[in-house]
Amino acid sequence: DLHLCDRRQRQMCIRDSAFIGAIVYFASDNIYWGFFAAIICYIITLVMADMTAPAFQKFYDKMDGISIPQPFCQSFVPFAIVINKLLDKIPGFDKLNIDSEGMKKKFGLMGEPLFLGIVIGCGIGALGCASWKEVLDNIPGILGLGIKMGAVMELIPRITSLFIEGLKPISDATRELIAKKYKNNTGLSIGMSPALVIGHPTTLVVSLLLIPVTIFLAVILPGNRFLPLASLAGMFYLFPMILPITKGNVVKSFIIGLVALIVGLYFVTGLAGFFTLAAKDVFEATGDPTVNIPAGFEGGALDFASSLFCWGIFHLTYSLKIIGPAILVALALGMAIYNRIRMTRNDAKNASTHKE
C-alpha cells in the first residue's frame, strides 16, 4: 500500500524512532549507530502500518484508507498475535467473548461506558485510601473521581468521533489526489494519529482497569525499579492495534495488555540507566529543568521504552555490535521486500477485478 503520513503522525513516528536513536547514541557515543537504529525503527514501523491497515480499517468505523504508522502502537502487534492465539487454544476461553456492545446487551445499564467509568473511578479512589475510615471520610472526593471517570468514558468517544468526521474529507481528498498520480495503486493508506481511535469503549475500560494494576505490579515485581506515573497517560496508546486482533474482546485485551506491561516494566528498568544518561546530557547542554533527574534516581518512559521495538532494536544495535545490526538490516529489508511483493500482487488482483 502506498503510505502517506499527515504532519502530526509523521512527527510522532519520527519522534519515537528518534527516541531509540537517541538512546543508542548516548549509550554507544556514536551518532551513526543512533541514526541506524532510528532508520531501522522507522522502516519497520511503516511496513507494519501497511500490513496492519486492512485489519485496522475493518475493525474501526469510518477508518477506510487510514493506517497507524506509530512505533509504540505497532510494536505490540506481534506480541498480541502470539498471546491471542495462545488464548484461543484454552478450552472454553472462546465463550468469554465480551466486547463493548456485548457488555451493554448482557449487563444493560451496568455495561454502559458511563456506568463503568463511575465504578472504576470510585474503585481507584477507594484504593487510594489507607483505611476504611479514610474511605468514609473521603466519600465526596471518591464520588467526584467516579463522576469524572464516567464523564471521560462518555465524552472521549464523542470527541474522537468529531475528529474523525473532520478528518474524513481531508483523507478522502488526499487519496483521490494521489490516486490520480498513482493510477494503478488501489491500496493507498493515509497515516494518522492513534488518538483518532483511543475513544473506543474497550480501550477506555481496559486502560482504566490497568492503571491501578500496573502501579501495584510495579511495586511487587521482583527486579523492577520503575514506578510509572506520568507515563500512565500513555496507557491508552497500547491498545489501538491490539483491538483489531482481539476483535474488541475486553478479557483478551486486558490479558494481552497485562502481559505486555509486565514485560514492559522490565524493559524500562533495563534501559533506565541509558535513559538517565541521555537526560543528564540534555540537561547539561540546555539547562532544561524538565529533564533534570535528581541524584540517586533513574528515569524511564513506559510509553515507548516498554515496547518490543525499543528494547529489541537497542540491544541488537548496542549489545551485539556486528551480528545485531546485520539481523536488523536483514529483517528490515525482508519486511520491505515482502510488503512490496504483497502490494504488487494486491494491485494486480484489483486491476484484473476492475477489468472484469
State where each predicted segment sits.
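Alpha-helical transmembrane segments and their helix-start/interface "positive-inside/aromatic belt" motifs
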Residues: N30-I39, G111-L114, G141-M149, G248-A260
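Membrane-interface helix-loop-helix junctions at boundaries between adjacent transmembrane segments
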Residues: R15-P78, P91-E112, D137
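Hydrophobic core segments of alpha-helical transmembrane domains in multi-pass membrane transport
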Residues: S17-Y25, A38-D50, L116-C129, G146-P157, ...
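Transmembrane alpha-helical segments and their short flanking loops
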Residues: Y60-I66, K133-P140, L177-N185, N224-E356
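Single conserved hydrophobic/aromatic residue that forms the stacking wall/gate
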Residues: D1-I14
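Long, well-ordered mid-to-C-terminal structural blocks that present hydrophobic/aromatic surfaces
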Residues: L145-P228
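Juxtamembrane inter-helical linkers in multi-pass membrane proteins
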Residues: F56-S100, E165-S193, V282-D288, S352-E356
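Membrane-embedded hairpin module used as a gating/binding unit in multi-pass transport
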Residues: I81-K183
